[in-house]
Amino acid sequence: TRDGIVKGIDLYTLSNTGAYGEHGPTTVGLSGHKSIPLYGKAEAFRFVSDVVYTNHMSAGAYRGYGATQGLFAVESAVNELAHKLNMDPIALRLKNTVQEGDVMPAYYGAVNTSCALDRCVLKVREMIDWEHKYPARDMGNGKIRAVGMGMAMQGSGISGMDVGSATLKLNDDGFYTLMIGAADMGTGCDTTLAQIAAEVLDCPLDNITVFGADTDSSPYDSGSYASSTTYVTGKATEKCALKLREQICKLGAELLECPADAVEFDGKVVFESADPTRQKTLSDIAFASQFGHKIPLEFTETHTSPLSPPPYMVGAAEVE
């Protein structure tokens, strides 16, 4: 509309998949499924794609996996639309961005359960000082500086399919061991998953030793792909940490000879709520767990999700 409301989106993608099909349909699918949903006010959309064989190398998975190409096209079109409407491209986007609670167009009918895209746009506008730099500035000596921006989204694994598992235990020295099936391929997932456990257990990151993927001994994980590890394996790690924390309190209460609901755990000691001077250190509890107690201080948990909640991104650039 003339006031900047996007009523419909029509996207066509042509994908060169090389000499073999392999990831052809899924890659081209994401060019629409990870771009159209950004504009939640659209009342209708059409997404058509063709995948063609050529004599090029086979095309497979790479970071972004089709989403980046679709996003470049859609975001470029939105910027052109803003120019035709004589409207600030950020203002145009803020009128149309998907909101929490919206059914996302072209995203399998999923409801957007968590979203701060509009706030992300505003933050980027502030960071690049958009109000003083848009659309362009004459720097003299024939130089012009201009600013531009765009939005993006991804997913968090393949819904209903990806599986992540983790094993977490308390050692007799009061430190923790986290065993995961996810492979750290430079993404830092060993650190990320340890941070999740450390937050639940109220302990320093250095108190957790991570043993990465070893198919002979690690719990099962379907793979480190599709931006799934932090969400899927991370949730399994959180489940482990919550159960382990509960059992630490239970054993601590047993050693203090009081009910489990009468104690608290601060990451270092389990203490009686009514009398904090009565306490057992984590080392005491870990040591006691080795002597015939029926309370396990080791848990393995698995997580999968029927949804693939999208993280959102906004970028801006100043070019000369």
How should these model regions be labeled?
Residues 1, 13-18, 98-102, 153-155, ...:
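Acidic, glycine-rich active-site loops and adjacent beta-strand->loop/helix elements
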Residues 1-76, 153-163, 308-309:
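Glycine-rich loop/linker segments at domain edges
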Residues 26-37, 61-96, 108, 119, ...:
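Alpha-helical support elements that line or immediately flank enzyme active sites
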Residues 135, 260, 272-310:
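Internal maturation/activation junctions in enzymes
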Residues 97-175, 301-306, 315:
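Helix-loop-helix junctions that connect adjacent transmembrane helices in secondary transporters/permeases
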Residues 2-11, 38-40, 70, 77-79, ...:
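Structural beta-strand/beta-sheet cores of well-ordered domains, especially the beta-sheet scaffolds
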Residues 15, 45-50, 167-169, 204-229:
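Flexible glycine/proline-rich, aromatic-decorated loop/lid segments
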Residues 7-12, 89-98, 135-150, 179-181, ...:
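Beta-strand segments within the central parallel beta-sheet cores of soluble alpha/beta enzyme folds
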